C-alpha cells in the first residue's frame, strides 16, 4: 500500500503534465504513450489491447483521471512487484514529463540547482508531502528538510528566519497550508533559503539527503575491514541500509566487494585495540563475524549506533527508518491538531460560561432592583398605616365601638402584614446569599485572569531573552567573519612576498648559470695560472667572508634586499696599460676562479646545503598556503 501511494504521487504529476488545458482530461493517445512507458520502467508485461477494451465506449473523446484510474489500478499498479524495478528510473520518467511543462530553470547556468538536483528535490518533496491531492508539503516538513540540508552543510537557520521565509511565499490560499513542489523548487532557485552556499556544496548536500531519505542509506563512509582468507586489512567504502551493509572499492560505488546481510539475530560489539588497529568493532551474523576499524572513537560510535538502528528495524519488521519517522511526525501533527481543536472547544466553553455568568449577574441586578422596590413599597405602606392610625385615634373619641371593631380588624391586618414582611426579609436574605456566591465566583475568575497574565508576561520575557541570545550569536558570527577576512588578507600578503622571493631566486640561479659558463671558459687557462693560486685563495677567503654575511637562507616574511646585486655589481678590475699578455691572462684566470668560488659558496648559502632549493621553497609555500579543503 505504501509503494502504491508513492507511485501514484509520481504518476499524478505525469498525468497533470499531459493535461495542457487544465480541464482534468487527457487524450487517449497520450495515455497510451504514458501507459507504455509505465509498463517499461515497472518491468510489467505490456498489454496494448487492455486500454482500448477498457475505454471501448469512449473512442472519440478524452479520458478523465477518474476514467483512467480503474485501468491504472487493475492493469499496472496491481501487477507491480517491489524490488522488480528501479524506482529511480520510474521517478526520472515522471519527472521528465512534468518538468517539461512546469519547471523553468535558468538557462544561462546561474541557477543554484542543476537538473539532477531539481529531480532529487522533487523526489524528496514527494516523499515528505501529504497523501492528499493536489500534493503539498506542510511547513513542518519543509522545516525538517531544510534542517537536513543545513545539517549536511554544517549550517544552522533560526526559527525566525524560517518563519519569515515561509511567510514570504504565503501568497495564495494553498500556500497558507503548505507549498507546492514548484514553489518549493523556486524557493531554492531564488537563493533565499540557502544564502552564500555554493552550487557544488548544495548539490553534495542534496545528494546526501536524497541517499538518506529516498535510498534508505543510514550511514556511509570509509572503514578498515579485515579479510577472511588472508586476514589482511583493506580500506573499503561502506554503505549501510536497513537490510544490509555493503562495501565497495571506492566511494563511487562502482566496484562492489561484498554484502553483509542484517537481520534481527545480528549484533554489533566493540573490540579492544590490537594488531596496530584502533577503534575496532565487529558485526556478528549467523554465519560469520566481520571485524572493522574506524578512524576515531566518534566514528566508531556513530557506526555502531547506525548498525544497531538497522538491526532494530529488522527486528520490528520495518523496511525504512525515515518512513517510520515520517509517520511519527504525521501522528504528532495530528495530535497537535486535536489538542488545538480541544483548546478551541475549551475556549468556546469558557466563553459560554462567561456569558452565563454575565446573564446571572443581570438577574442579580434585577433581583436587587426588585428588593429596592419592595422596601420602597414597605415604607409607603408603613406611612399609610401611621396616617390611618392617627385618623383612627382622632375618631376613637366619638365612636368607641366602631374604634374597637376597627382596632380588631387592624390587628388582624397587622398580623398579615408582618407575615408578608417576614417572607420578604427571608427572600432578601436568600438574594444576599446568592450575591455573595456570585461575588466569590467573580473573585476566582479575576484570580484566574491574573495568573494567565503572569504566565503571558513570563512567556514574553523568555522570548525577549531568546532574541537577545540570537543577537549575541549574530554578533559572534560577524566577528568570526571579520577574523577570516583579516586572515585571508595576511595570507595574500605572504603569497605576494613568497612570489617576490621566488623571482629573486630565479634571477640568482640565472646568474649562477652564467658563472658556470665563465668557469668552463676559465678552466682552459687554469694550468697557466697555478703560480697565482695562493694569492687568489687569499682574495677568495675575503670574498667568502663578505658574501656569507650577505647571503642567508631566505625565510618567509624576510624583507632583505635581493642578492642579485652581488653578482651584477661584480666587474673585473681594469688591466694596466703596460701589463703583459701573460699577466693579463693570469690575472683574469684568478678573478674567474675567485668568482667561481664566490658563486659556489653563494649557491650553497642560498640552497642551505641542499641541491633542491626550489622544492624547499615550494614546501614553505605549501606550509604558508594550506589547501582549500583544510
Swiss-Prot record:
The modification Phosphoserine is found at residue 590. It is found in: Cytoplasm; Cell membrane; Nucleus; Cytoplasm, Cytoskeleton. Disulfide bonds: none annotated. Its main location: cytoplasm. The keyword Membrane applies. It comes from the Eukaryota. Interacts with IRF4, activated RAC1 and F-actin. Both the phosphorylated and non-phosphorylated forms bind phosphatidylinositol 3,4,5-trisphosphate (PtdInsP3). Interacts with ZAP70. Interacts with RAB11A. Phosphatidylinositol 3,4,5-trisphosphate-dependent guanine nucleotide exchange factor (GEF) which plays a role in the activation of Rho GTPases RAC1, RhoA and CDC42. Can regulate cell morphology in cooperation with activated RAC1. Involved in immune homeostasis by ensuring proper trafficking and availability of T-cell regulator CTLA-4 at T-cell surface. Plays a role in Th2 (T helper cells) development and/or activation, perhaps by interfering with ZAP70 signaling. Required for optimal T-cell effector function, lymphocyte homeostasis and the prevention of systemic autoimmunity. The modification Phosphotyrosine is found at residue 210. The modification N6-acetyllysine is found at residue 225. The PH domain is essential for phosphatidylinositol 3,4,5-trisphosphate binding. It is linked to Defects in Def6 results in spontaneous development of a lupus-like syndrome in aging female mice. It is characterized by the accumulation of effector/memory T-cells and IgG B-cells, profound hypergammaglobulinemia, autoantibody production, and glomerulonephritis. Residues 216-312 form the PH domain. This is Differentially expressed in FDCP 6. The keyword Membrane applies. Residues 331-341, 378-392, 620-630 have a biased composition (Basic and acidic residues). SMART domains: PH. Tyrosine-phosphorylated by tyrosine-protein kinase LCK in response to T-cell activation. Thymus. Keywords: Acetylation, Cell membrane, Cell projection, Cytoplasm, Cytoskeleton, Membrane, Nucleus, Phosphoprotein.
Amino acid at each position: 500500500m505504501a509503494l502504491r501511494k508513492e507511485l501514484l504521487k509520481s504518476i499524478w504529476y505525469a498525468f497533470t503534465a499531459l493535461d495542457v488545458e487544465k480541464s482534468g482530461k487527457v487524450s487517449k493517445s497520450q495515455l497510451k504513450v504514458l501507459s507504455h512507458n509505465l509498463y517499461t520502467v515497472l518491468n510489467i508485461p505490456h498489454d496494448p489491447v487492455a486500454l482500448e477494451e477498457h475505454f471501448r465506449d469512449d473512442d472519440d473523446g478524452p479520458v478523465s483521471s477518474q476514467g483512467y484510474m480503474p485501468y491504472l489500478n487493475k492493469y499496472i499498479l496491481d501487477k507491480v512487484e517491489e524490488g522488480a524495478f528501479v524506482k529511480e528510473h520510474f521517478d526520472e520518467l515522471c519527472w521528465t514529463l512534468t518538468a517539461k511543462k512546469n519547471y523553468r530553470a535558468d538557462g544561462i547556468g546561474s541557477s543554484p540547482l542543476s537538473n539532477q538536483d531539481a529531480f532529487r528535490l522533487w523526489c524528496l518533496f514527494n516523499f515528505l508531502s501529504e497523501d492528499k491531492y493536489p500534493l503539498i508539503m506542510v511547513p513542518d516538513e519543509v522545516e525538517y528538510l531544510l534542517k537536513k540540508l543545513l545539517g549536511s552543510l554544517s549550517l544552522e537557520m533560526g526559527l525566525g528566519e524560517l518563519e519569515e521565509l515561509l511567510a514570504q511565499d504565503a501568497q495564495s490560499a494553498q500556500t497558507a497550508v503548505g507549498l507546492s513542489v514548484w514553489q518549493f523548487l523556486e524557493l531554492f532557485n531564488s537563493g533565499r533559503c540557502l544564502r552564500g552556499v555554493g552550487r557544488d556544496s548544495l548539490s553534495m548536500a542534496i545528494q546526501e539527503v536524497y541517499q538518506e531519505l529516498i535510498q534508505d542509506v543510514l550511514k556511509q563512509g570509509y572503514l578498515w575491514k579485515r579479510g577472511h582468507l588472508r586476514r589482511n586489512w583493506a580500506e573499503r567504502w561502506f554503505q549501510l541500509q536497513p537490510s544490509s551493509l555493503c562495501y565497495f572499492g571506492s566511494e563511487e560505488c562502482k566496484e562492489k566487494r561484498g554484502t553483509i546481510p542484517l537481520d534481527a539475530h545480528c549484533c554489533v560489539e566493540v573490540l579492544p585495540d590490537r594488531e596496530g588497529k584502533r577503534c575496532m568493532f565487529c558485526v556478528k551474523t549467523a554465519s560469520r563475524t566481520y571485524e572493522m576499524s574506524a578512524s576515531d572513537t566518534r566514528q566508531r560510535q556513530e557506526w555502531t549506533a547506525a548498525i544497531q538502528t538497522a538491526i532494530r528495524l529488522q527486528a520490528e519488521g520495518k523496511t525504512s527508518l525515515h518512513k517510520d519517522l515520517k509517520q511519527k511526525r504525521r501522528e504528532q501533527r495530528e495530535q497537535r491538531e486535536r489538542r488545538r481543536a480541544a483548546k478551541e472547544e475549551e475556549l468556546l466553553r469558557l466563553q459560554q460560561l462567561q456569558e452565563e455568568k454575565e446573564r446571572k449577574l443581570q438577574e442579580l441586578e434585577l433581583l436587587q432592583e426588585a428588593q429596592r422596590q419592595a422596601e420602597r413599597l414597605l415604607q409607603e405602606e408603613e406611612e399609610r398605616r401611621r396616617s390611618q392610625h392617627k385618623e383612627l385615634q382622632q375618631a376613637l373619641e366619638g365612636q368607641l365601638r366602631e374604634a374597637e371593631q376597627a382596632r380588631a380588624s387592624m390587628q388582624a391586618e397587622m398580623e398579615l402584614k408582618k407575615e408578608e414582611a417576614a417572607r420578604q426579609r427571608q427572600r432578601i436574605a436568600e438574594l444576599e446569599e446568592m450575591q455573595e456566591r456570585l461575588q466569590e465566583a467573580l473573585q476566582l475568575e479575576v484570580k484566574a485572569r491574573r495568573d494567565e497574565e503572569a504566565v503571558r508576561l513570563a512567556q514574553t520575557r523568555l522570548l525577549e531573552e531568546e532574541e537577545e541570545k540570537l543577537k549575541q550569536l549574530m554578533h559572534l558570527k560577524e566577528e568570526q567573519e571579520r577574523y577570516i577576512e583579516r586572515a585571508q588578507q595576511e595570507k595574500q600578503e605572504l603569497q605576494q612576498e613568497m612570489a617576490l622571493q621566488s623571482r629573486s631566486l630565479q634571477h640568482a640561479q640565472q646568474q649562477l648559470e652564467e658563472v658556470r659558463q665563465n668557469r668552463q671558459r676559465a678552466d682552459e687557462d687554469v694550468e697557466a695560472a697555478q703560480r697565482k693560486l695562493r694569492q687568489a685563495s687569499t682574495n677568495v677567503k675575503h670574498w667568502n667572508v663578505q658574501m656569507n654575511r650577505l647571503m642567508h637562507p631566505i625565510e618567509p616574511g624576510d624583507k632583505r634586499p635581493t642578492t642579485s646585486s652581488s653578482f651584477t655589481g661584480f666587474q673585473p678590475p681594469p688591466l694596466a696599460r703596460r701589463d703583459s699578455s701573460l699577466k693579463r691572462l693570469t690575472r683574469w684566470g684568478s678573478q674567474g676562479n675567485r668568482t667561481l668560488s664566490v658563486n659556489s659558496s653563494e649557491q650553497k648559502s642560498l640552497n642551505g646545503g641542499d641541491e633542491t632549493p626550489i622544492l624547499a621553497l615550494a614546501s614553505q609555500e605549501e606550509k604558508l598556503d594550506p589547501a582549500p579543503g583544510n
